[in-house]
């Protein structure tokens, strides 16, 4: 009954997504934000990590058709902190992915509680920031997003923290110490950080695109492990917009990543690299302003074409299929419309190993709502051009 306030009744013939929210055990209304995917306990299976804003952080594991919270250690669930962002990657090359929880108990500037950087010793989690050697490098600035960056291409990840009203952080492990290298790398800019993504955008290594609010976006070119800011040179600065969710996608199916980025109640962008400049090829339907929070690009229905999921807060979500030549075709999103959904984050993973991606959406901010979970209804009889 509680979940009916989020979803809409749509005939089966119109559904792109099947609603499988019933698979989530003990799915109570709550305030959630960012979602990540990781093998939390190194058991060979992925979990959805869901942040809680004054609620437990969750590690949703799959077993026999059910998603259940698999971690109950107090340092992980951290109910008394307000967690807004999460990323997971192996920063020390020990085979376990560390988990960075970004806490934000104030809108902007200085905050009370620092972030968590959780390591797993095979039995329990511990916070690397609680070690005395790392106390001088705590992030005590409000933030919005966090992403892992393999800047040297050697598998030793760093963590970029998009702060709001304070300098950007870039944490790496140096010996036994967690060091903020943002100043050394020249990326300690002060802005209204909102979203951040990393991948091979321009160089052969991990570049960084950061969508910001009340200021220009950043595009960092990875020059042998150092960063050069080129947003204005490549025409992705979008100075007068308020950036939100962003994703990387091979929009032209040509073997290179381009940038999908959104703006709060402003035009959404599909930046494609042409002649050493990014050109926005978004059509009227795709670019239509909305109260957007998250953008995801993935092939949900295994037809060889990527879909773009746009998660809005307080208004309907949208779904587009990227066809050949960068054509965006809006498709009926079906059960995942969520007209009254207060979307704050989302992630995709093949959580049950059946070869089809699940979509998990988190909600909150202005009201308590449960998580929702969707799976594409694949029509096997329909031909697919790209997979023949």
Language-model features: locations:
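Acidic/hydrophobic-patterned starts of short beta strands in beta-sheet-rich repeat architectures
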Residues: 42-51, 93-102, 153-162, 203-211, ...
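Short, small-residue-biased leader/transition segments that mark boundaries at the very start
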Residues: 1-6, 382-384
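Beta-strand-rich domains and repeat architectures in extracellular enzymes and scaffolds
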Residues: 23-55
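Short loop/turn motifs that recur once per blade in beta-propeller domains
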Residues: 16-29, 71-81, 127-140, 181-190, ...
């Amino acid at each position: 009954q509680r979940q009916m306030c989020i979803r809409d009744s749509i005939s089966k013939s119109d559904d792109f997504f099947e609603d499988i929210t019933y698979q989530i055990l003990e799915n109570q209304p709550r305030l959630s934000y960012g979602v990540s995917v990781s093998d939390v306990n190194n058991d060979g299976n992925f979990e959805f990590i869901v942040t809680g804003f004054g609620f437990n952080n969750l590690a949703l594991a799959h077993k026999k058709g059910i998603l259940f919270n698999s971690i109950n250690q107090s340092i992980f669930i951290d109910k008394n902190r307000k967690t807004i962002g999460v990323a997971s990657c192996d920063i020390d090359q020990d085979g376990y992915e560390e988990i960075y929880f970004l806490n934000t108990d104030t809108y902007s500037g200085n905050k009370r509680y620092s972030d968590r950087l959780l390591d797993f010793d095979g039995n329990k989690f511990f916070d690397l920031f609680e070690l005395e050697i790392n106390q001088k490098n705590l992030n005590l600035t409000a933030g919005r997003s966090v992403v892992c960056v393999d800047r040297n291409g050697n598998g030793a990840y760093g963590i970029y923290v998009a702060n709001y009203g304070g300098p950007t952080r870039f944490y790496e492990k140096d010996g036994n110490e967690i060091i903020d290298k943002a100043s050394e790398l020249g990326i300690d800019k002060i802005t209204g950080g909102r979203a951040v993504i990393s991948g091979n955008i321009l160089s052969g290594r991990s570049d960084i695109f950061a969508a910001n609010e009340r200021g220009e976006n950043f595009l960092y070119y990875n020059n042998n492990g150092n960063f050069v800011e080129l947003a204005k040179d490549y025409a992705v600065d979008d100075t007068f917009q308020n950036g939100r969710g962003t994703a990387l996608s091979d929009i032209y199916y040509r073997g290179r990543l381009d940038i999908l980025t959104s703006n709060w109640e402003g035009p959404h962008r599909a930046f494609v690299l042409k002649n050493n400049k990014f050109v926005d090829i978004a059509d009227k339907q795709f670019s239509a302003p909305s109260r957007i929070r998250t953008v995801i690009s993935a092939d949900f229905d295994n037809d060889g074409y990527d879909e773009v999921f746009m998660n809005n807060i307080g208004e309907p979500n949208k779904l587009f299929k990227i066809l050949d030549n960068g054509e965006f075709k809006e498709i009926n999103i079906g059960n995942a419309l969520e007209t009254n959904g207060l979307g704050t984050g989302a992630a995709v993973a093949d959580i049950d190993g059946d070869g089809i991606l699940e979509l998990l959406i988190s909600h909150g901010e202005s009201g308590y709502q449960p998580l929702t979970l969707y799976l594409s209804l694949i029509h096997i009889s329909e031909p697919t051009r790209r997979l023949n």
